[in-house]
UniProtKB/Swiss-Prot annotation:
InterPro entries: Rotatin, Rotatin_N
Biological role stated in the UniProt entry: Participes in the structural integrity of both centrioles and basal bodies and in centriole cohesion. Participates in the later stages of centriole assembly through the interaction with Rcd4 leading to the centriole to centrosome conversion.
Record localization: Cytoplasm, Cytoskeleton, Microtubule organizing center, Centrosome, Centriole
Listed GO biological process terms: centriole assembly; centriole replication; centriole-centriole cohesion; centrosome cycle; ciliary basal body organization
One Pfam short name: RTTN_N
Protein name: Protein rotatin homolog
Source species of the chain: Drosophila melanogaster
Annotated family: Belongs to the rotatin family.
Length: 1977
């Protein structure tokens, strides 16, 4: 990069004068030169030196020469001059009138040329002059577009459209601008939309507009000069440029979407300080509405045809909806309505197409249907968006809008994902019952019914009966006789099951009634035919005594009311009613009556008791049968025969009831016979003598036959008076009358008066209702009726009683039913009728009562009318009535009603539309897959013809199968013979892709790529080929943008393998047209951003180099837009693995720095250029930083400090650019360059003195600037952190103080914005979590550089503020990632930095803050839920180590682990994954676990984390399989521990706790942790990479340490280790090492390579031995297998030579042997044995260690070395086995006491320190317990030692115990007895005084231990054998023993607790008794 500014270009005066040269050639050459320089400078924004007035004059004078050459170019230069910044000079010098006059002259000169372009330029120039001279200016909004006026011929509509757009904009369509451009950017944008009038140039200019659009924030286009609206205006042009305008609009919308998302991001926020009156912009929603309206105007004429513009318009509509979604804004109803109207129009067309030729139908439907599908999806998305964003949406209206989509079966079936989404949408729109539920119900019914017509899905028997309602819903609609037969067959087939399944019987009854009641006569006739067949068969089986149904008795069936089919009164009633209907055929009418006749004829076949079961079936329909019998003689005879008293098998009650019906018969003879029979029955009744005689006056045969014939019938309305709406007023009267009725002893006349008054009162309907509420009301009336007919009673009350009964029966239907089934009431009423036939009123009332009782199930009575549900004519009924046929709803009627409702609500009662919908639905249900639908597959079904699919329907289905139609387009493309046809086909394919996106089938996608590749592989050869090539490029861009794998992989492979591909050739063509280059670049960018796999080949590097060269070429040719296209590609290529050397990376970095500098501006114009260059630079820098190997990168650092300074200076200048993204990339580049330069930066920083305070101060200033974008503030902070080590701690601290950073950071915490998205309205300044992170990171860095500063930091309020931030974490709702990262990565890291020097601060603050600790656990949970949280978990682990160190916080964690064990397990296990091996994350995890295990060893078992984890049960999967770093274990109880441990209702006793000796029912957490550690151990040690010659890795050491500590602390882990054979693996590893021939013998190896090189082996051995030592220090780690013990012993012996080279290894190994023998008897045996191939056993080596460590000389005044203690302990342990004792005896170890415990010590003897001597005495004490070690020796030394040692000292006690042990062996008795010093010693011991109480003598002992040992020795020596007893009796010693015994006995007898607190007192007393007893024997 050159640091010098290039000199400004100039147009010399002499050069300008050449414009008026006489030579035409000179004039033209001068014009070319001036035009090139002038225009280029204007485009690049570079200054140019010239005289504007002179240039203008010369250009005007140009037209003085005839003929005028290239007038359009000269006028264009004048226009550019007037628009440029140089126009001011012209305006000042030349008045408006003069300028206008000169232009008039030019117009006259050019008048003859008739050039459209020239006239347009002159018109525009006139308008421009008005603006420049402020002459008659128009409003800003109009002027912004009027300056870009379009010629009148082509764009009169455009002008009107432009004006209309602005006229329609209202104040509410504007909003405050998000940001606003500077004047230079406004001028540039004006020039961008100052489009030429030539269509070719216009298209080129639009392409440039798309390329340059990225320079500006998209909101600029919604502000003057309103670029967006100008593009909308250009859509109305008719010059063929619509496709380019739409492409620009699509690009603008996508940029707008990106801008909206960017503005929502917190990192893009900066505190605004704009005034409230800042500029306005058109609202995005308003702009989208304008665009959508314009698009719909354009697409309406094209809905039924396909042009090159269709797909762009449709894509625009889709992008509009997507922009609304990104904006989170509702879509205005006007926009939705526009789409809905188009959807309706297209659907109406598609549904109306008719024809019989499939080809013609498909041609008519293909494009309209395709666009219909697109708009269906758009409408669907619009309504779905409004549900989310419009809370006040009219859901009913929204549902009406999408109703056409819901009914588009072809659309939903072809797009199942849309169907699912639409169902969800409809359910969300339905707040209550929805008409769509009816449609869904019908469709489900059709589906079930159609399944019945398919053999594979047909239901039979009970299953079909259970589903009958769904089938019957559509039975009539389908008109299928097959379904009717299946349903009836199911009813008959299930007859055997009805007895045991009442629900099935009920369903069968309902089904049969539904079938009988079918409205379709054809289907009903079929049912009757089937019923006749079944019923006759059953009846004949009675006659022939055969079986009707296998397994069922005929009589049993009839008892179940089954005669051929199940029967119910309702079914019979319906059949009888149908027998009288006019539309029923005569045959069917006859059959309807034959059925009950057949049932009644069973009277002659069945037993009486069986017929009595059958007759109740007929009783409810008996009124109807008798009514029909009037005109049906056979029926009359059958009924009469059944009721005949002499032959009837019925009960008399039923028989009497039947004859009463005939009293209403129109035939007098029938009535007479019935009356006579009734009278006869009444006379023959029992207890007849109790009542008044019925025939006392008239003989029976002379009784009138018209007793119940009331002519005319009594008017029902006169029974009850009309009541008002008021409440019943006669309540008191009714109560009084009722009380009188209840009285028993009232007179008859009073009772009659009472009944009469009550009768009158009950004419009120409400009074009847009140009377019905009386408890005994009905009973009193019935008693009155009964008493009135008794003999001897007054009959005066009979008439009012019957009248009251009549009214009450009408009023209460329940009472009526009860009375109708009471036989006594019939007899009472008939007696009254026969007693007083002459009383008309009584006869009338009785007749009406009988009518009510007989017809009770047929009548419904109200206050003003009586209704019968069937026509009872010709019976003569006694009261007037109305007939209302009661329709019982069935599934069929419900289905028909549903069908009508759906037709009304969904199809607007358009039957044709509804029929088509159901035809399509039937076809889809039958054929399942749209592609398999054929006319033949549906025509074979037994359904109505109107429901079978037609040819037009099939065409609609096929046109909806987009993959199939797209395949047809490929065929059409192959058959194209013209370029235009091919282009049209490609446009159609693009239209298909608008809706299909990336959901193409593999075959279609592959064919699509083949088509594209065929035409883009070679470069076009002519103009026609060029157009096809561009259309194919456009198609290729679409495919790759939709991420179609075939296109992506295909193009990638083609570019990699085909070096002559058109892309390769055209990209290197410097003359390539801009539009073609732009399309190629779009292809490449989409490819690079969507490529599925990153090839390992070097294709990207080569491509990068080629593109860089091409960009350079274009730049040299000043083809700047070409360069922009290339830079966009390079941006993506730079992200790939370029495989460049460091030198290449540095070279290209400098190249792009120079390229960036060549077009540097401070405004938005050209910012995309800068972004691309800087992004490429950043990527190259990243490659350079992370290049391998690292050392080579240092060589690429530029040695020239000056060059690095220039680069840094350049980046710093761009840090002040107007574009925020440029600034951000500049800071990133700056940081990367600082990293690359390393130490050079320290030399450069002082030279950056042009920055106030230098670069670090500039970084801090930017960081604290609230008006800067958050991202840039963060980047500046990161750069400062990079610079801190370079400027030093003191300078950094000084800067922090100067900027008061701690205070600023604390204040920023108050306004922290803790979400990643910004609110819609921000009040006051905000600070992102990332900015806060920078503040915290600076503090952390400062503490690391200057630890003593941490104290000052801890005293600042910032630390408490950070604690409060941590407390903001919510345990329930998931927090934002930036907040989690701030807390986990920065705040926790800062707190952990305070541990070293300021732990007390942490203990006093966060360790005691329970809220902080609780949020710390919440933070762990949030971090673990992220995808890549490794870098965030490390600070959390550091904090965990701190909390474990503090007792208070450690207790809190232990308590929390009880409630959240799974959280802690996730925390621990995540870092133990093998993928994280050797990572810092894993190392900290292992450290944390080691601390947990260590604390478990120190703490009580019940109060440690490990103990709680052992209680936590979980299911554990294979530990070797894990995905993405997550552990595959599943907690049995989420956030809870095992139920058997923590169930609140369970007992907390020991029985409920887990114990190691219990069977493991579930894997606990300790075992899981062990498995993870074991897996890591295997990864370290069982891999081929293991080498003992290399130092062990840190992780390797930590894993072994953690394993050892876990196995020491956990019994469960020990068991798991046994199962996984961990010990065997360790032994195998050590064995392999010892067998390694490369190493061999230890001494030889060390001698060969030197001691320093053997340290790696020592270290590896130390790691394993230390793990084993920790492990086996636990008493639970017992080795019981002999083979394992032997192997370990052999390994330890073989390792022994290495111990001489490491004192620490020797110490640890001896300790391991000590622990092994401590807990394992087998180990003691194997250590004692001599192993094969070895001269000494391991026990011998231990003895040598003990001997060496004892006898070696030690430095005076130094702590004694106790390394012999473990060795002696091994010797002690081995004493337990015979082998060990034998080996020890052979070593003569007791000879050591000659050295360490001489009998007569002198100065020449070895001085042994007391601890060493005690250790040896301890060994001797144990060894002397056995015969091989109990030999009496060194007696004098022991005695002397005892005498020299103070009483009760450890050494003295050990010596006494050794003597005691010697006394136990008889071989030592003679010598000991004869040893006077020994006896005297015992006497002296017994003479010692012992304190008996606290006040006893002060010099006394506090224990009887020595006395006990002395007495024990005396007992063993003298208590056995007369000789020895006699020797003792003659000594003073015996007297001492007696005195001691007496003293002890007296003391214990007088005061039991005298020696209770003195040790060994009781033991001594017992031994004295035993001794004395022995002496007495």
């Amino acid at each position: 990069m050159s640091t010098k500014q290039s000199p400004a270009l100039q147009l010399a005066e002499g050069q300008l004068t050449k414009l008026t040269s006489e030579s035409e050639e000179i004039r033209m050459r001068a014009l070319d030169q001036i035009e090139t320089r002038f225009i280029r400078c204007l485009q690049l924004g570079e200054p140019i030196q010239f005289k504007p007035v002179l240039l203008l004059k010369q250009l005007i004078r140009w037209f003085g020469y005839t003929p005028p050459l290239v007038p359009d170019r000269v006028l264009a230069m004048i226009m550019e001059l007037l628009r440029s910044e140089y126009a001011e000079a012209v305006i000042r010098k030349i008045p408006y009138e003069r300028f206008k006059a000169e232009l008039q002259k030019v117009r006259r000169v050019l008048h003859k040329q008739e050039s459209k372009r020239v006239s347009e330029l002159l018109d525009d120039m006139n308008l421009l002059l008005l603006e420049k001279y402020n002459i008659d200016r128009v409003t800003p909004s109009v002027s912004s577009l009027s300056s870009n006026d379009i010629p009148s011929q082509a764009t009169e509509s455009a002008d009107s459209s432009s004006n209309q757009i602005y006229d329609n904009l209202k104040p509410e369509d504007y909003e405050p601008s998000w940001s606003h451009p500077c004047l230079d950017d406004v001028a540039t944008m004006k020039s961008m939309i100052d489009l030429p009038r030539n269509s070719v140039e216009l298209q080129l200019q639009l392409t440039e507009l798309i390329i340059r659009m990225g320079d500006y924030p998209t909101e600029y286009f919604l502000q003057p000069p309103f670029v967006f609206l100008h593009l909308v205006q250009l859509q109305t042009m008719t010059d063929g440029s619509l496709i380019h305008v739409n492409r620009a609009l699509i690009a603008c919308l996508r940029l707008l979407q990106q801008r909206i998302l960017l503005r929502r991001n917190t990192l893009s926020y900066a505190d605004r300080f704009d005034p409230p009156s800042r500029p306005k912009q058109v609202k995005v929603v308003s702009a989208l509405v304008i665009l959508l309206e314009n698009c719909m105007k354009l697409i309406r004429p094209l809905l039924f045809s396909c042009t090159n513009d269709n797909w762009h318009i449709m894509e625009l509509i889709v992008e509009i909806v997507r922009t609304h979604d990104v904006l989170s804004s509702k879509i205005p109803l006007v926009s939705i309505t526009l789409i809905a109207d188009a959807v309706k129009s297209l659907l109406a067309y598609c549904n109306s197409v008719e024809g019989s030729c499939m080809t013609q139908l498909m041609d008519s439907l293909r494009i309209p249907r395709l666009q219909s599908l697109i708009l269906n999806g758009v409408l669907h998305d619009m309504v779905a968006l409004n549900i989310n964003y419009d809370k006040r949406m009219d859901r009913r209206q929204a549902k009406a809008l999408i109703q056409p989509i819901v009914l588009d079966s072809a659309y939903l079936s072809g797009m199942p994902e849309r169907m699912k989404s639409l169902n969800t949408l409809i359910s969300s729109l339905d707040s209550g019952p929805s008409p769509d539920e009816e449609l869904i119900k019908l469709k489900r019914a059709y589906s079930v019914a159609l399944n019945q017509l398919h053999p594979n899905t047909e239901l039979t028997g009970s299953l079909l009966i259970q589903k009958y309602r769904q089938v019957c819903l559509v039975l009539v609609q389908l008109g299928s006789e097959t379904l009717v037969k299946q349903l009836f067959g199911a009813v008959v087939k299930c007859i055997p099951f009805y007895a045991g399944n009442l629900k099935l019987r009920k369903d069968a009854d309902e089904l049969l009634y539904t079938l009988v009641d079918l409205p379709a006569l054809k289907l009903r006739s079929l049912i009757y035919r089937l019923m006749i067949k079944s019923t006759v068969a059953h009846f004949h089986s009675f006659m022939n005594k055969t079986v009707y149904m296998t397994g069922c008795s005929n009589v049993d069936l009839i008892r179940q009311h089954i005669l051929g089919v199940p029967l119910t009164p309702l079914l019979l009633r319906r059949m009888i009613i149908q027998s009288s209907e006019a539309n029923t055929s005569e045959r069917m009418q006859q059959w309807c009556l034959d059925y009950p006749i057949m049932i009644m004829k069973l009277n002659a076949i069945l037993a009486p008791q069986d017929f009595s079961v059958v007759f109740p079936l007929l009783l409810p329909v008996l009124p109807l049968l008798i009514s029909r019998s009037v005109t049906h003689k056979i029926l009359h005879n059958v009924i009469w025969n059944v009721l005949e008293p002499d032959s009837s098998r019925l009960d008399p009650q039923l028989m009497l009831r039947g004859y009463v019906y005939f009293m209403f018969h129109p035939d007098g003879e029938v009535r007479s016979e019935a009356t006579t029979t009734i009278a006869y029955v009444l006379q023959c009744q029992e207890q007849t003598n109790r009542y008044l005689p019925t025939a006392s006056n008239v003989p029976v045969e002379h009784i009138a036959n018209d007793l119940c014939i009331i002519q005319p019938p009594f008017c029902y309305r006169s029974i009850f008076i009309k009541c008002s709406d008021e409440r019943f007023q006669g309540q008191r009267s009714l109560d009084a009358l009722f009380r009188l009725l209840q009285a028993k002893d009232i007179k008859s006349n009073i009772r009659k008066s009472t009944m009469t008054q009550l009768n009158v009162l009950l004419r009120n309907w409400r009074a009847c209702e009140e009377f019905s509420t009386k408890e005994d009301g009905y009973r009193l009336i019935m008693e009155s009726l009964h008493n009135a007919l008794k003999k001897g009673n007054d009959t005066d009350i009979l008439l009012p009683t019957v009248s009251i009964l009549m009214k009450l029966l009408f009023n209460d239907d329940e009472f009526r039913l009860e009375v109708a089934n009471t036989f006594g009431v019939y007899t009472l009423l008939l007696r009254a009728l026969f007693l007083f036939p002459h009383l008309e009123q009584l006869r009338q009332d009785v007749s009406i009562c009988l009518f009510q009782m007989l017809f009770q199930n047929c009548i419904t009575s109200t206050e003003d009318k009586l209704v019968l549900n069937a026509n009872m004519e010709p019976l003569i009924l006694p009261v007037t009535y109305e007939i209302e046929h009661k329709v019982i709803p069935t599934a069929v009627t419900e289905g028909l009603e549903l069908q009508q409702n759906v037709e009304a609500t969904h199809f607007g009662r358009d039957r044709a539309k509804a029929a088509q919908h159901w035809r399509l639905y039937m076809a889809y249900r039958v054929c399942q897959v749209p592609s398999s639908i054929t006319l033949e597959s549906v025509s074979a079904l037994d359904i109505r013809e109107s429901l079978k699919i037609k040819m037009a329907d099939l065409a609609l289905v096929r046109s909806s199968d987009l993959n199939e139609q797209l395949s047809c387009q490929f065929i059409a493309a192959e058959n194209c013979s013209k370029h235009e046809d091919l282009q049209k086909t490609v446009s159609a394919i693009q239209l298909f892709l608008v809706v299909l996106r990336n959901s193409l089938s593999d075959t279609v996608a592959e064919n699509l790529w083949k088509l594209i590749h065929k035409y883009i592989r070679l470069a076009p050869g002519n103009e026609a080929d060029d157009k096809v090539y561009k259309s194919m490029l456009d198609l290729c861009v679409t495919c790759i943008r939709f991420s179609q794998p075939h296109a992506i992989n295909g193009l990638s492979y083609a570019l990699e393998t085909d070096h002559h591909h058109s892309f390769q050739l055209l990209l290197h063509d410097s003359q390539i047209s801009l539009d073609k280059l732009f399309l190629i670049c779009q292809c490449m960018m989409q490819l690079l951003s969507n490529e599925l796999s990153d090839d390992s080949m070097n294709w990207y590097g080569k491509f990068f180099m080629q593109l860089s060269a091409v960009a350079k070429t274009h730049f040299e040719l000043r083809q700047l837009q070409h360069v922009r296209c290339i830079l966009c590609m390079l941006r993506f290529v730079s992200e790939r693995n370029l495989k460049f050397s460091n030198a290449q990376l540095m070279s290209y970095s400098q190249h792009f720095i120079q390229l960036s500098s060549n077009l540097r501006t401070s405004t938005q114009t050209g910012s995309e250029w800068q972004r691309d260059c800087l992004y490429i630079i950043c990527q190259l820098q990243i490659h350079l930083i992370y290049q391998e190997p690292k050392a080579s990168s240092k060589a690429s650092i530029p040695n020239d400090v000056g060059a690095s300074y220039k680069v840094l200076r350049y980046f710093l200048t761009l840090c002040g650019h107007g574009d925020s993204e440029v600034r951000a990339l500049s800071w990133v580049s700056l940081a990367n360059w600082i990293t690359i330069c390393g130490s050079q930066v320290a030399e450069i920083l002082p030279r950056l003195d042009f920055l106030p305070g230098g670069l670090p101060a500039c970084c801090l200033t930017t960081l604290t600037d609230a008006h800067e974008m958050m991202l840039i503030r963060e980047l500046a902070g990161r750069v400062f952190i990079l610079l801190m080590p370079l400027i030093g701690a003191e300078s950094s601290l000084e800067l922090l103080r100067k900027h008061d950073l701690l205070k600023t950071a604390y204040n920023s915490l108050k306004a922290i914005h803790d979400t990643p998205w910004m609110f819609k309205k921000i009040v006051g300044e905000r600070h992102s979590c990332e900015v806060i992170s920078c503040y915290v990171a600076i503090c952390t860095k400062m503490v690391a550089m200057k630890p003593e500063w941490c104290a000052a930091l801890c005293g600042h309020s910032l630390m408490s503020g950070l604690s409060d931030v941590m407390k903001k974490l919510k345990s329930q709702a998931s927090c934002s990632i930036p907040l989690v990262e701030l807390c986990a990565s920065q705040i926790c890291e800062l707190y952990s930095m305070c541990y070293t020097n300021n732990f007390e601060f942490l203990k006093m603050t966060i360790c005691r803050d329970s809220v902080f600790l609780q949020n710390y656990l919440t933070l762990i949970n949030d971090v673990l839920s992220l995808e890549c949280p490794e870098y965030m978990v490390i600070p959390l682990l550091k904090m965990f180590l701190i909390f474990c160190t503090d007792s208070n916080s450690n207790s809190f964690l232990i308590e929390q682990i009880k409630n959240k064990p799974s959280l802690f397990m996730d925390f621990f296990l995540f870092g133990l994954h093998v993928k994280l091996i050797n990572s810092p994350f894993q190392r900290f995890t292992l450290s944390a676990l080691s601390l947990v295990f260590t604390k478990a060893q120190l703490a009580a078992y019940d109060i440690s984390m490990l103990s709680e984890l052992e209680k936590f049960e979980l299911a554990f999967s294979d530990p070797d399989i894990a995905k993405d770093g997550k552990q595959e274990f599943e907690s049995k109880k989420k956030q809870s521990v095992s139920q058997c441990i923590y169930d609140e209702s369970s007992d907390n006793s020991d029985d409920n706790k887990q114990r190691p000796n219990h069977a493991i029912q579930a894997t606990n957490a300790a075992i899981i942790i062990f498995h993870r550690l074991d897996q890591l151990f295997d990864r370290y040690y069982l891999s081929k990479a293991l080498n003992f010659l290399e130092l062990p890795a840190v992780g390797q050491v930590q894993v072994c340490e953690a394993l050892g500590e876990l196995l020491k602390a956990s019994t469960w882990a020990v068991k798991a280790a046994g199962e996984s054979k961990l010990l065997g693996k360790v032994v195998h590893i050590l064995d392999d090492f010892l067998n390694d021939e490369k190493i061999g013998n230890a001494a030889v190896y060390v001698k060969r390579v030197g001691p320093h090189k053997a340290q790696s082996i020592i270290s590896n051995l130390l790691v394993l031995i230390n793990m084993l030592s920790q492990w086996h220090s636990s008493p639970n780690s017992e080795i019981i297998q002999t083979s394992m013990a032997a192997n370990i012993a052999k390994i330890l012996i073989r390792i022994w030579p290495w111990l001489s080279h490491s004192y620490h290894l020797k110490k640890v190994t001896v300790q391991l042997i000590m622990f092994l023998t401590e807990h394992s008897f087998e180990m003691c045996k194997q250590i004692s044995l001599l192993q094969s191939g070895h001269a000494q056993s391991l026990l011998h080596l231990m003895a040598r260690v003990a001997d060496f460590e004892t006898t070696k000389k030690e430095i005076p005044n130094k702590e004694p070395s106790l390394n012999m203690v473990p060795a002696l302990r091994v010797m002690v342990n081995c004493c337990c086995c015979t082998e060990g004792r034998l080996s020890l005896s052979k070593m003569n170890l007791l000879d050591m006491f000659d050295t360490i415990l001489p009998a007569n010590p002198c100065s020449t003897h070895l001085k042994v320190r007391p601890p060493v001597l005690i250790a040896w005495l301890g060994f001797w004490e144990v060894f002397s317990r056995y015969d091989v070690g109990g030999k009496a020796c060194h007696l004098q030394s022991l005695i002397n030692t005892i005498r020299r040692s103070p009483p009760l000292s450890h050494k003295r006690i050990l010596c006494l115990r050794i003597l005691r042990n010697m006394c136990f062996f008889n071989g030592n008795r003679p010598r000991l007895v004869e040893l006077a010093d020994f006896i005297n010693l015992l006497r002296d011991i017994l003479e010692q005084r012992v304190q008996k109480a606290p006040t006893s003598e002060k010099n006394g002992l506090n224990s009887f231990e020595e006395h006990r040992l002395a007495v024990l020795m005396l007992w063993k020596l003298f208590g056995f054998g007369a000789k020895y007893k006699g020797m003792l009796r003659g000594t003073k010693l015996f007297k001492l023993l007696i005195g001691l015994r007496v003293e002890m006995s007296v003391v214990f007898s007088e005061e039991e607790n005298k020696y209770a607190g003195v040790p060994y007192a009781n033991d001594l007393a017992k031994l004295l008794e035993k001794l004395m007893e022995s002496m007495r024997q």
